[in-house]
Amino acid sequence: LIKADGTAVWLDEVPYEYGVAGWAKPKMNTNAYDHEIVIAGKEYKHGVFCHANGTLVYPVGGQYVRFEAEVGIDDTSSGGSVFFQALNTVPTFVAEELNNKYPEEIGMLGAVLDGLDTWLITPDASVEKQAADNAIARLKDGAYYSNVAKQIANEKDLNTQIRKYLELVEKVQELYTLQSDLEWLNVEAVKLAFADMKKQKGYDAAKYEPMLNELVRLEKKGFKGIYNGDEQAIADAKKALECKRAILLANPLLDADKIVAARFKVGSKAHQIMTPSLGTQANNWSNQESAGREGFDAEIVELSNLRGDIQMRQVYKPKNGSSIADLKLHWDGDRVMFTQTQDDKRWNIYEVNLDGTGFKPLVENDEPDLEFYDGTYLPDGRVIAISNIGYQGVPCVNGSDAVGNMVLYDPKDKSMRRLTFDQDANWNPVIMNNGRVMYTRWEYTDLTHYYSRIVMHMNPDGTENKALYGSGAMFPNSTFDVQPLPGHGSAFVGIISGHHGVARSGRMIIFDPTKGRKSTAGMVQEIPHRNRPIKEEIKDQLVNGVWPQFIKPTPLNDKYFLVAAKLDPHALWGLYLVDVYDNVTCLMQAEGEGYISPILVRKTKTPPSIPDRVKLNEKEATFFIQDIYEGEGLKGIPRGTVKSLRLHAYEYAYVKTRSDHNWHGIQSGWDIKRMLGTVPVEEDGSVIFKAPANTPISIQPLDKDGVAIQWMRSWVTGQPGEVVSCIGCHEDQNQIAIPKRVIASQKAPSALTLPEGGTRSFTFDLEVQPILDRACIACHNGEGKAFDLRGGKKDKLGYGTSYLNLHPYVHRQ
């Protein structure tokens, strides 16, 4: 920046008033990797690094008369292009003003442009032409409208040309919406739903059967003329869609006629966003603590008149720019629980009545570093929430994403107790029809962690915690947003997704664990693909490129569901009624907005309250195994082989601590293993023992020489005073125990035989190095050709010489 007298100041020396970048934040004098900025081989001591699309606003204040800059792409980039302009206005701010005044028009334009900044600062019609071309390219047949665009290109008057391009964009976008809706017009599916709804009390079949007949007639006539400007074809298509909508929304399950949901105003990016812009986490491995905490325009809304001109009423809107997450409707149907930030930006769970009154926090806790989110009501008035109470972090990101485990909280006396002691995230606790708690648990220890998010269920006090679906399988990677089907003991609906890639949303699946507990065995159906078999697919980014994308389903019964969805890459996030017959019917969507977490407002039966079984005055739990040889864990192992069990506890990575891939070893586990001791196995394979409660315990069956035959690669946690029992080793959860007297059931529980040296960590230095010292270092002493196996010396990562020399010869997975 140069003044009139010729003096100058470097831009990096002037603080900017406003700065955004397409990735990370604008940086002064360094590139993305914190090295010196280099453009075309030239190093720059002064410079601003800003990833596209970026905007920087500097105060000029009449001091400067000239601005000079060299603009280019940093040499560390693999390629690309750069567009740079200095302006006296901020296009982003102007775009926001336009969006507030004209949301429909700006939203439609934003659907075909990557941001509005370039459009607002381009003096000719090139951006409008590009918008029209982009819109036409999305049509199945764009020839007619391509000719219209060519005619506009010959227009001499610039203002007329710009106006006609924008009018064309609007018309083609409306046609594209019609095209998209027709893709979800499945007459056979409508017939099947109609036949089912006829059986429901309150469905007026006589009223809607003529509409079904009209729909059949129009569908046979066809709608190809919509691409040629045929107004009759367009009218027929709209009429057919109106018939479909009327038939399906007449479903008596919607007679309550009210839906509560979260509404997000997202502006011109509404067609491009994914669910992190609607308050979810930006990945599939973190909890709400890693989601955005501010900068949202979100509210809880109630939608009514669902079959007509939908009415919207605000229930609650945060005043601090927080998102709205984890909506849960109480069984009384008059209030909702949700997650938002407090004034200090920490997450907490709150409640508000649907009439807008009664807003209050549901967890009151004085600890300054605890957060609570993803809560659920319990039938007895208590609540369960996810919390960072363990101060753990996800190991592969060095603890930068905090881990959340479940806590039980009583609003009456403000008492709290931790329920789960898991290595990584718990998600979405929800009450099943039998009063148990269903949730998703991510397991990370000693296994392929891309594919290990398991649906669990337990009693509300944490007892009887067992796998419900997915244990021991690699498909699906993740199952989120599980919700029990009304009237079913164990069936549920959920969203399957990947590990990396698309975050939180994915494919919508109905599960029935009574049919199978792994992979596709218990997957009853994918919605909306009634006739498409579900195939096992072991893939990291499981749902990348998959459409529709679903999130937050709510079952109305076992056939009809409310869900938030984005039907294709260019669609808005809206609310839909979907069913097992493949119908997908939009209830609500709006330009510039996104909707999530739809719940039908109705009173439902409160599940039974399961009394607490824990004995909080005890420090141990009892573990009973009827027959260690039952189940796939020890399949093929001859009876009598297992003589004892070795028990170890996991010590998990703490938040924001070094814990990455090579921190504990090379090709090793993520966690420190703390040896607790051994217990005997009876001749008939039965075992009974006591072990510390509230401790994640893993088990290794040992032979007569103390050698591990198998590895649990998971953990079990007993609550204080609980008797944890199982049939065998990773037995099928659908297997029924055969009543029989076993040796262990007639004995008192065994106490742990402590390991040599007492309870301690299991490490190379303590277990392996003493053997090398006794048997190997006479020759392997670093003096001859034999590699060195002496201990003691460590490198900068803490690895000893013997460990580094030996590890290539030992496969440990």
Model-derived regions, located:
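Gly-Asp-aromatic-enriched flexible segments
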Residues: 1-93
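Beta-propeller blade signature
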Residues: 84-87, 298-304, 350-355, 401-413, ...
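C-type cytochrome heme c attachment motif
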Residues: 245, 335, 350, 384-385, ...
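Residue-level detector of Asp-centered blade-edge/turn motifs that repeat once per structural unit
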Residues: 254-255, 331-332, 378-380, 432-434, ...
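Hydrophobic beta-strand positions that form the internal "hydrophobic ladder"
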Residues: 259, 336, 383-384, 437, ...
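Short, conserved, GDST-rich strand-edge loop motifs in beta-rich repeat architectures
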Residues: 264-295, 341-342, 346, 385-402, ...
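Multi-bladed beta-propeller domains
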Residues: 308-322, 353-371, 409-424, 459-478, ...
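Solvent-exposed helix-loop boundary motif
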Residues: 310, 580, 657-683, 690-728, ...
